Amino acid sequence: MLGVEPLLREEATEAAVKQVKSPFILHIATHGLFETTTNPKDPTIDKDSLLRSSLVLAGVKEEKIDGDNGLLTALEATGLNLLGTELVVLSACDTGVGGISPGEGVYGLRRAFAIAGAQSQIISLWKVDDQGTKDLMVKYYQRLLDGNIGRTEALRQTQLEMLRGQAGEKYTHPYFWASFIPSGNWLPIPPRQK
């Protein structure tokens, strides 16, 4: 089902991610950032809300001539070509948070990837543990790629397995599994069209 084309370590640059065209599934495992507002009592939307959520990519500390700084902001993510993309998994900290707009919801990476065309997303609501997240994702994909289970149900079953200690006692605390939530299409991933 998956024709994986990994971008690993120094290959996972902002420019390389921006060139990805309509992948069936896009999985980004990196660091996520969210800059809070200067007034935490007023988390409402501001003109820069889509600039406050970002993913850290390779070369973030290097000076760039082309304008890419190694941070893929939510605003930049809206310009990705994700039409036909069934699922985006943002396996990083704070990928589900953003500026809040009354009547509109959260402006952040989830909204950005939906605007770009992704049918569904798996996002996180707080800082996550690297090893626990890796183990959760491996089990999630094992269930998901079976083909008989929906995207949300695959995540739910994986989280229950961790809660019950079936993935190891160290993962029973919600910190390790409850951060990840689904958004969008909850149905099984359809067979990939050739």
Language-model features: where?
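Catalytic cores of enzymes
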Residues: 1-194
